[in-house]
Amino acid sequence: MKFTLSWLKDHLDTTASVDEIAEALTDLGLEVEGIENPAARLAGFTLAHVKSASQHPDADRLRVCVVETNEGEKQIVCGAPNAREGITVVLAKPGDYVPGIDVTLSVGNIRGVESHGMMCSERELELSDEHDGIIELPSGEVGERFIDWLAENDPAKVDPVIEIAITPNRPDALGVAGIARDLAARGIGTLKTRAYAPVPGDFDCPIKVTIDEDTRDGCPLFTGRLIRDVRNGPSPQWLQDQLRAIGLRPISALVDITNYMTYDHNRPLHVFDADKVKGNLRVHRAAGGETLKALDEKEYTFQPGMMVISDDEGAESIAGIMGGDATGCTEETVNVFLESAYWDNVQIALAGRALKINSDARYRFERGVDPAYTLEGLEHATQMILDICGGEASTVVIAGAVPDHSRAYKLDAERVRSLVGMDIPESEQRQTLTRLGFRLEGNMAHVPSWRPDVQGEADLVEEVARIASLTKLVGRPLPRLTDGVPKPVMTPQQRRLSMARRTAASLGYNECVSYTFIDQASAALFGGGTDATMLENPISSEMSHMRPDLLPGLLAAAARNQARGFADLALFEAGPVFHGGEPGEQRAQIAGLLVGRTGPKDVHGAARAVDLYDAKADAEAVLAAMGAPAKVQILRDGDGWWHPGRHGRICLGPKKVLGVFGELHPRVLQAMDVKGPAVAFVLWPEEVPLPRKSGTTRAALALRDLQAVERDFAFVVDAGVEALTLVNAAAGADKALIEDVRVFDEFIGGSLGEGKKSLAITVRLQPTETTLKEKDIEAVSAKIVEKVAKATGGTLRG
């Protein structure tokens, strides 16, 4: 919501500065998002007088001017066609920043002639698009600040523009009058009350309006009147300036008046060209399939049940959202029908979302407008049209009635203290509510029609506290139930996630926090995107489904970083993923993503691309931090978004999956617009077994008194035999002595023959009772060879 300071002062008698107003608005809950003050960018420019202007000796289109400034006479080279002796101009000196051309001036040399400054055009000062010549002022003293001259002669050019963020519960603040009311209640000036007398009708309105019975819940009230013999030319300069200041383009007097009413009083209106309306108007629900070309020149198809305004020949307006092109006003329009109606906010929101139309009218109606101002807004707009466009007005046609909005709640002065903790005198509380438009009868506060958000006694307390300022609230420490510093309360799952985050960060990963909603295509890549995870009311089409995995968010972040030149990335995230709407279909997950290289090239060699072993090592480190057992199995056959043959599942047995690591499928990387190589891991903290003991200290490391022995074995097996099968067989030969089995070599080809390979392992034997003798080692070795042969069909390589 944007408005200018002068516009605000139309409703508020105040001497407060822009900064004071901005601070008060933010404190009142109307957060100021920005202030555009033209005076700030024009502060350095001064007025000067051209004493002489002669032809440049080396350029036909340039003139050498002698300019009188507050620092004496200066020579300036100028190419403007209107640069001549005797005019008063706006001067930019060396060192001044000229916003329209984004240049800080310095003393220049133009074709051999020095130039000590610049005489500015309106476009160079961002005052307008005019750039045919330099600014000529009808008055002004040499050295006078240009902003001071503008403030006196053309104040709209230096009128500050304030932009505030409006929360959905404050539709009254979508009008400048509502903002002024809040400021007046705070004490930042006095509210200017305006009474708009009804405009008497000079003739009966020839256009009648009816509302179908099944549509009255969506349109309780419709008012309108015919105004004939209007002149729809350009609107007055003051109106054009106000609209331009807030980013609206002036179109014509009639359209500008309706736009003004929208922002001034949060009262959207619509103007029909009455000569194009065929017969009477009817508010009804669409049967479905009807089409209408709207004012944005797009054609829309109505769904069954949408509210429509039709004449005798068909639909002419999308009710409460946008008018039709066929009955729109042009410069030739002389007779108009002015509409002011009250529409149900929910039905307008549903229709606008279905038709994908974002208009000022929809934005306001779906948040709620003042139902009691419907007729008064019509009278106000009628008077503006008569004043600006001329003409004569008919009597008002009214269909329906103002919906009952009356409600009252008890004002309990003690509730402010109990709910907010502020001591505010009862008289001040009553005065605050009165200034906000509440009507007090005894201890009952009647809510004004423009405040649909006030729905109970607690809301009255909020209004009182908001106007008094919550910055005055004094903090009080909570009472302690126990002495000393309380211990943090964390569940085992929370402790695991915290430790996992710290470990991933210590490994060099940057934490991401992404949306839990993603688009359907991305969700489908990772096993989701079904109706079970589709949102009923998504923020946008790109956020239509709950995420089935954390990797889509990490890949999207990687794609954005790569698009900005960051090729090497290490990202992780911890959060929930979803496979349905039931509690058991939501799980916690930790995911990490490595993209690009592990580091830059250096004196030790070239940069190394990330591989699946990087992801494996990091996954094991995070699992260890969460308390996972050291001995796990690495199995094949992960999900389809992993590269086949280049990933593994970290398991405790065939069914207990702790996580997955490996390369991502090239198809997934291409779909997510990520340039590889890319490896990742995902972990399931809930699958990590809890420790049997609840002690917080880790057991001391047990060192063996007896020396361990290592023996190497090389087995020739079929090419299809997995190394894990061989390792498990060797480890099971003697579980009491064999502490560890590791693969250290694989060989294919040579004398082994077709379909064979050699796998070499190191077996570590750790005695517990006595030192191993050679015969003991040989006995264990024989068991290992026997077990491997039985499990894999392999033979010891000679």
UniProtKB/Swiss-Prot annotation:
Keywords: Aminoacyl-tRNA synthetase, ATP-binding, Cytoplasm, Ligase, Magnesium, Metal-binding, Nucleotide-binding, Protein biosynthesis, RNA-binding, tRNA-binding. Its EC number is 6.1.1.20. Its main location: cytoplasm. Residues 404-475 form the B5 domain. Residues 704-797 form the FDX-ACB domain. SMART domains: B3_4, B5, FDX-ACB. Tetramer of two alpha and two beta subunits. NCBIfam families: pheT_bact, YtpR. This is Phenylalanine--tRNA ligase beta subunit.
